[in-house]
A protein has these predicted regions:
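Short carbohydrate-recognition loop motifs
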Residues: 54-73
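Flexible glycan-contacting loops in extracellular carbohydrate-active proteins
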Residues: 177-205
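Localized edge beta-strand/strand-to-loop motifs within extracellular or lumenal beta-rich domains
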Residues: 152-166
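Bacterial signal peptide processing site
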Residues: 18-20
Length: 211
C-alpha cells in the first residue's frame, strides 16, 4: 500500500509539473490587414541591391525591380509567414519590352513558391516554382486576357487559400487552380525577362489580408 501511495504521489507530481497544452493562436478575422506597405520608407524589409543583373530597391515612393539580363527573374519578400492569405499590389511597367513577367508570389519557402504573373502585352499565368523548375498550373502557356491594361497601372490580387489559388486583375477574377504542394510561407513581388533584357517595373500599395 505504501508503494502504491508513493507511486500515486509521483504520478500526481508529474502531472502537476507537465506543461499546459499550447492553445493554437486564433486567426485574425476575415478582412484583417496582416501587412501593408506603401514603400514610403526604405526600412520595411524588402531587398535592396544592385549588380550587373539588375536592381531591386525602393524608388520614388514605390518598389522597383529592373532586370538587365534576358531569361532572368528577380523576386523580393518582406520576410513574413502566412498560410492562407490574400495579397494585392498595383504595378506599372516603367520601361523595357512588353514581353515581360511581373506579379505576386505566395508561400515562398527556400526558393519554392506560387506565382501570379502578367505581361505588359496582355498575358497572364498562375504557376509554381519548385526545386528550380517553373510550371504553369491549369494552362500549358500564358494566356491573353483583356483585363490586363498595357502601359497602365494594373491592380493584381492573389488568393492563396487551402489548395485553391485564385488570380484577379483589375478587380476581376481571371483564373483559379488547385495545388497542394505548398501550404505556407512568405509573400512578395517578382519581375522577369524573356528574350529581351531591360524589364523595369514599379510596385506600390502592397497589402496582405486575412481571407
Amino acid at each position: 500500500m505504501k508503494f502504491l501511495l508513493h507511486l500515486s504521489s509521483f504520478i500526481f507530481l508529474l502531472a502537476a509539473c507537465a506543461p499546459a497544452p499550447t492553445l493554437a493562436t486564433p486567426l485574425p478575422p476575415s478582412g484583417s490587414v496582416l501587412f501593408e506597405d506603401e514603400f514610403d520608407i526604405n526600412t520595411t524589409g524588402w531587398d535592396r541591391f544592385a549588380n550587373e543583373g539588375g536592381i531591386m530597391d525602393y524608388f520614388e515612393g514605390g518598389y522597383r525591380i529592373l532586370v538587365q539580363r534576358p531569361g532572368l527573374n528577380y523576386w523580393s519578400t518582406p520576410e513574413k509567414d502566412y498560410g492562407d492569405v490574400r495579397i494585392e499590389v498595383d504595378l506599372l511597367k516603367l520601361a523595357g519590352p512588353d514581353e515581360n513577367r511581373m506579379g505576386l508570389m505566395c508561400r515562398y519557402q527556400n526558393g519554392n513558391h506560387y506565382f501570379f504573373i502578367i505581361s505588359n502585352d496582355g498575358y497572364y499565368g498562375i504557376g509554381k516554382f519548385i526545386a528550380g523548375q517553373a510550371t504553369l498550373l491549369g494552362q500549358s502557356e500564358m494566356q491573353s486576357n483583356e483585363m490586363i491594361q498595357p502601359n497602365m497601372i494594373n491592380h493584381l490580387r492573389a488568393d492563396c487559400v487551402g489548395d485553391k489559388l485564385t488570380f484577379y486583375v483589375n478587380f476581376t477574377e481571371i483564373a483559379s487552380v488547385q495545388d497542394d504542394d505548398l501550404s505556407s510561407g512568405d509573400i512578395g513581388v517578382l519581375a522577369g525577362s524573356f528574350s529581351q533584357p531591360g524589364v523595369d517595373v514599379s510596385f506600390d500599395h502592397f497589402v496582405a489580408i486575412q481571407p
